[in-house]
Amino acid sequence: MNAPVAPTSVMPPGSVPPTAAELEQIAAIAHAEAGIVIASGKGSMVQSRLAKRLRALGMSDYGTYLDYVRSDDGREERQRMISQLTTNVSHFFRENHHFEIFRDKVLPDLAARAKSGGRVRLWSAGCSNGQEAYSMAMTLLEALPDAHQRDVKILASDIDPMVVARGRAAEYDAQTVSPVPEALRRKYLEPAGANYRLCAAARALVTFRELNLHAAWPMKGKFDAIFCRNVVIYFDPPAQAALWQRFAGALAPGGWLFVGHSERVPAGPGTPFDTAGITTYRLRGGNAT
């Protein structure tokens, strides 16, 4: 009599971690596509972020997954992979000192310009779910209540199409909107079932779009202020330096740049920027016009 055959153990998709070689390939794609740096010791992080993608695609191993994302058919999945490897964390009025500077030093001149028919452009670069851009919008509406009826626009961009869609929906749960001061909640947030939605004026100010900061930018006009916070921490030093230079080229003279609490922009003689506050910089060249 033959011995019973043990059942074959089938590992669920994504349960086997990437090999060192596969991790190196994933890191190379992330760096080439988006300038993101993944350290060699981040295998468990990569597995935890990408396992759900392998499960969704029914792929048992990272070799098969890599073959797919490198193929022409895998272009969209390549973008999803990049999105999964970054952390989409944002809060309303995060690092509030930036919004105080924005309110007290940036907006008075911009509001006066808009009132006289001038153009105002702002950018939330790496906007995540939209909280930063809508914090900018609420602060702007406090300074200029009819801003949405003037030539004033906020661009909110992110590499992740899913967070861009959530930002465009402009709907958040009670916990998410809790950092919004009560007076602003009453003015700019409307009940939407169990959630809250930004009012029409705030939504009208913000345009969301997918944008890879590491790729070409389609925008032609200059910005008066750029918020790019806790984004370049994923980049290596050369990619960071290149991005600061590109922001300098995208800002109007005297334009403002706000970065994350752990990020620093070279400032002073020989650089395009001067320090204007905590993690706040201003492009040289006179007052914004």
Residue ranges of model-derived segments:
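Core SAM-dependent methyltransferase catalytic element
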Residues: 225, 266-289
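Conserved beta-strand signature within the Rossmann-like core of class I S-adenosyl-L-methionine
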Residues: 254-261
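Conserved SAM-binding loop of SAM-dependent methyltransferases across substrates and taxa
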Residues: 129-147
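Conserved AdoMet
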Residues: 2-123, 260
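A short glycine-rich, Lys/Arg-flanked "PGG" loop and its adjoining helix->strand segment in the class I
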Residues: 241-253
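Residue-level signal for inorganic ion chemistry
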Residues: 102, 226, 251
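Extended basic-aromatic, gly/pro-enriched interface segments that bind polyanionic ligands
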Residues: 125, 146-227, 231-242, 264-266, ...
